[in-house]
UniProtKB/Swiss-Prot annotation:
One biological process term in Gene Ontology: inflorescence development
Superkingdom classification of source: Eukaryota
Polar residues composition-biased segments: 117-136
Source organism per UniProt: Arabidopsis thaliana
Localization of this protein: Nucleus
Residue ranges of the region described as Disordered: 101-138, 200-242, 290-317
Pfam families linked to this entry: RRM_1 (PF00076)
Task of the protein: Component of minor spliceosome required for U12-type intron splicing and alternative splicing of many introns. Binds specifically to U12 snRNA, which is necessary for branch-point site recognition. Required for normal plant development.
Keyword Cytoplasm: no
Protein name stated in the entry: U11/U12 small nuclear ribonucleoprotein 65 kDa protein
Gene behind the chain: SNRNP65
Length: 442
């Protein structure tokens, strides 16, 4: 009978026939399958010791590869461990637990287990069965001193709400206040193969919209005027479609592809309306005046001061654009990042020369004095201090070099005018590489 048991292949034995080598001290043995590949024995032992295991015997080959026999002292520990470990996800694997022994003949069970041990090269690893594991399994309270007298639920799962502006703002504040949390977030981004955040700010993906928010948007769109209804309805529909497909950049995205090419719609973290580029709408006003007789017209013409006419003309002709006009004419930062012409934009090293491109075809030299004149005391000082070199032919057409009297003035002008829409095209301004690239205009 013993020779027949040792010659029988170990893989053909059902799992329910395995019993512990020493039934009296161990009591109950469980067979745990689907362990992670290549996991060390000490990690397996520490894992099962938390559930009250007294000994762990991993298997190394055959049908019981990635499996282990776990011994328990009594039926209570084994039943609780079977209930908690079965279906547990451990390092990407779902554990499968079943009983490995039943009250059969001890002699037969020992012969079967010895044959399996020889065929699969079992290695027995004993663990320390201290009092802590028994206390945890028996339901130790979480914090009795604080009034929490119930044990920690083993099957607790969390259901987090979707992100919104307040949640993201609180997370940002926590990252600033707790430096270890910031380091752990960077570690997690590295493990998930996300693009590194050490660069300029990228467009923010749209936040998921809830049901009440969509109804509010529909109510707002219905209350708008008839002249803007077509455009607003088109933008709202496109916004909903993009929000439906707009996901955060994750594992499925190539790391070499920049975010700008993905087509993520820029949005703001603060709960406000979607920013739109303001369009100047020209409204034609027709004034209808009553007919005036010749005598009345003469009296009015005599009362008018002839010196008022040149004053009105002078008030309409401004020597240079004001700071408010430049600020209103600039594109918002989120719109600048979304334009392909600003892809990989860098300001460069500060110098007295500004390199400007993406200019309209009908731009002339006087336009630069009008745009940058606010940096000088008067238009005469601007024409004498600002050197302009406008390229109007060849491959450099639509580009210009401006020479300022100092680096501070050039830096202030770049921050003020970069992205300013002039004659239908946004200006792209960078620092020039060589100070001698631009010469004063004679």
């Amino acid at each position: 009978m013993a020779a027949h048991a040792t010659s029988e292949p170990a893989v053909n034995l059902p799992a329910t026939q395995f019993e512990s080598q020493v039934t009296e001290p161990f009591g109950v043995t469980l067979l745990v399958r689907h362990l992670p590949d290549g996991i060390p024995h000490d990690i397996v032992s520490r894992l099962f010791s938390q559930y009250g295991a007294s000994a762990v015997r991993p298997c190394s080959g055959g049908k019981l590869r990635n499996a282990a026999f776990v011994d328990f002292k009594n039926e209570a520990f084994a039943s609780q461990a079977h209930r908690q470990l079965n279906g547990l996800r451990f390092l990407g694997k779902v554990l499968q637990v079943q009983r490995a022994n039943k009250p059969n003949d001890n002699k037969k069970s020992r012969q079967i287990e010895e044959s399996v041990t020889k065929g699969n090269a079992f290695s027995t690893v004993s663990t320390n069965n201290d009092s802590k594991s028994g206390q945890i399994l028996s339901g130790e309270p979480i914090a009795p001193k604080l009034g929490i007298d119930y044990p920690f639920p083993p099957h607790l799962q969390y259901a987090y709400p979707p992100p919104d502006a307040n949640i993201l703002a609180n997370i940002t504040n926590a990252l600033i206040a707790v430096p270890p949390l910031y380091t752990q977030v960077l570690h997690l981004m590295n493990k998930m193969n996300l693009p590194p955040p050490f660069r300029l700010a990228l467009p923010t993906p749209p936040l998921p919209k809830a049901g009440p928010q969509q109804t509010d948007l529909e109510h707002q769109s219905s209350s708008e005027s008839e002249m803007e209804s077509d455009e607003d309805i088109g933008t709202s529909k496109s916004g909903r479609k993009r929000a439906r497909h707009g996901f955060l950049v994750g594992l499925g995205m190539d790391k070499d592809v920049p975010h700008e090419t993905v087509g993520v719609k820029p949005s703001s973290l603060t709960p406000k309306e979607i920013p739109r580029i303001r369009k100047n709408k020209h409204v034609m006003q027709i004034k209808i005046t009553s007919k005036v007789t010749q005598d009345e017209y003469k009296e009015e013409s005599e009362n008018e001061d002839p010196a008022d006419e040149p004053k009105e003309k002078d008030s309409n002709l401004k020597p240079f654009a004001s700071l408010e006009e430049l600020e209103k004419g600039r594109l918002p930062p989120q719109d600048i990042l979304s334009l392909p012409m600003f892809k990989n934009y860098t300001a460069g090293n500060p110098s007295v020369v500004l390199y400007i491109k993406n200019l309209a075809k009908d731009v002339v030299i006087d336009d630069f004095y009008y745009i940058f004149g606010s940096q000088f005391e008067s238009s005469e000082v601007a024409k004498s201090s600002l050197g302009v070199r406008l390229m109007q032919e060849g491959r450099m057409r639509g580009q210009a070099f401006l020479t300022f009297p100092s680096v501070e003035v050039a830096h202030r002008a770049l921050n003020l005018v970069n992205g300013f829409v002039f004659k239908g095209k946004p200006m792209i301004i960078q620092f020039g590489r060589t100070p001698g690239a631009a010469k004063p205009n004679e």
